[in-house]
């Protein structure tokens, strides 16, 4: 029997000036006060002074998630508008002066910038993170190994970072390209079980590569604070329905992987090769990529891959059905990355200068 899992969602936002479209290096105390007042206990400061996080409570269904995110996104929009600001949710800003940004004042963020220097300064990026709760007896590393092949499809559904420094990058998720500059931020390591994971952490800590309370930043990781697996690969999504789709689809994959966790895994080495290749293709081409099917190992479109998912993992809940329907819509009509590129092209075709065209892209990236 498939038992529903609880889940939670974390969204990162940059604070942008609604007039100029730019990200201020140091938002005013009034702006930060508006954020804290609007989000209350769900507010968190992120690694830049101009970046915040909305961290949800635990949900049991998609209705709860939609109601919470709608309400808090709206409260944040209204509060920030009073200061001429807005929450920007796409994964990268098309023209932010990232070299001028300031790290958040909290000590652990200062340590990040001291340790990683230019890599940290360049990481002016928004991600979408989804936690799904798992039973205590579940080996979360084995669960991650089962989920690994599907990660590139989830990235392809979320891409929203095609522009950087005022230019198209050629990648639909340039955010994940920058993430690749960090240690321990790619796909999860090939560790067969929880015992191997603990040995791996112990080795990193013993050799000074990881602090005692340090985190790994894998694209999918076991949370150190909660009994969850945490999806981290996805770009931030301005469109709320895209967020809900990804959260529900990931939860669906987790539930079925837990239910069938005693079944033998297929050849994990080959699946890892395929996952790594598909990951690059999702970064580069997003929904337009020709992927490699996980089992038959033949080329497949993103829509074909979604169809394979539905055939292999039967849709058995209303939330999962809605997620698959919306995922198909996204794969047919485009992610926010596609929307940004269309917006930029249309603005230039309409005769707008580069700066005005980029401001139009920023306007499209605020929360909706």
Curated annotation (Swiss-Prot):
Presence of the UniProt keyword Disulfide bond in the record: no
Keywords in alphabetical order: ATP-binding, Ligase, Nucleotide-binding
Gene Ontology MF, one: ATP binding
Superkingdom, taxonomy of origin: Bacteria
Catalytic activity line of the entry: L-cysteine + L-glutamate + ATP = gamma-L-glutamyl-L-cysteine + ADP + phosphate + H(+)
Entry's EC annotation: 6.3.2.2
SUPFAM superfamilies named in the record: Glutamine synthetase/guanido kinase
InterPro entries: GCL_type2/YbdK_subfam, GCS2, Gln_synth/guanido_kin_cat_dom, YbdK
GO terms (BP aspect): modified amino acid biosynthetic process
Pfam families recorded: GCS2 (PF04107)
HAMAP family hit by this protein: Glu_cys_ligase_2
Function description: ATP-dependent carboxylate-amine ligase which exhibits weak glutamate--cysteine ligase activity.
Family: Belongs to the glutamate--cysteine ligase type 2 family. YbdK subfamily.
The protein's name in its UniProt record: Putative glutamate--cysteine ligase 2
Taxon lineage: Bacteria, Pseudomonadati, Pseudomonadota, Gammaproteobacteria, Pseudomonadales
């Amino acid at each position: 029997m498939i038992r529903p899992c609880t889940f939670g969602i974390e969204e990162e936002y940059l604070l942008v000036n609604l007039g100029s479209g730019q990200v201020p290096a140091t938002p005013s105390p009034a702006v930060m006060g508006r954020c804290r007042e609007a989000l209350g206990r769900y507010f968190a400061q992120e690694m830049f002074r101009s970046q915040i996080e909305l961290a949800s409570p635990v949900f049991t269904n998609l209705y709860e998630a939609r109601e919470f995110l709608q309400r808090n996104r709206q409260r944040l929009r209204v509060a920030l508008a009073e200061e001429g600001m807005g929450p920007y949710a796409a994964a990268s800003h098309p023209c932010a002066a990232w070299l001028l940004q300031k790290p958040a004042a909290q000590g652990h963020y200062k340590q990040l910038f001291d340790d990683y220097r230019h890599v940290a300064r360049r990481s002016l990026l928004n991600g979408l993170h989804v936690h799904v709760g798992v039973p205590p007896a579940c080996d979360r590393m084995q669960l991650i190994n089962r989920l690994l092949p599907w990660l590139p499809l989830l990235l392809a559904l979320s891409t929203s970072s095609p522009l950087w420094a005022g230019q198209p990058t050629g990648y639909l998720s340039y955010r994940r390209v920058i993430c690749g500059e960090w240690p321990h931020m790619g796909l999860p390591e090939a560790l067969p079980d929880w015992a191997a994971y603990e040995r791996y952490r112990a080795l990193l800590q013993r050799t000074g590569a990881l602090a005692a309370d340090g985190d790994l930043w894998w694209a999918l990781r076991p949370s150190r604070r909660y009994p969850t697996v945490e999806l981290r690969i996805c770009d931030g999504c301005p469109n709320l329905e895209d967020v809900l789709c990804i959260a529900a689809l990931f939860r669906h994959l987790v539930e079925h992987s837990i239910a069938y966790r005693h079944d033998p895994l297929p050849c994990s080495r080959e699946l890892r090769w395929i996952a790594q290749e598909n990951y690059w293709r999702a970064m580069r081409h997003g929904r337009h990529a020709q992927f490699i099917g996980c089992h038959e190992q033949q080329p497949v479109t993103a829509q074909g891959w979604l169809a394979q998912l539905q055939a292999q993992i039967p849709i058995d809940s209303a939330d999962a059905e809605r997620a698959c329907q919306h995922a198909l819509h996204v794969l047919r009509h485009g992610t926010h990355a596609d929307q940004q590129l269309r917006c930029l092209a249309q603005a230039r075709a309409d005769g707008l200068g580069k700066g005005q065209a980029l401001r139009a892209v920023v306007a499209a990236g605020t929360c909706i």
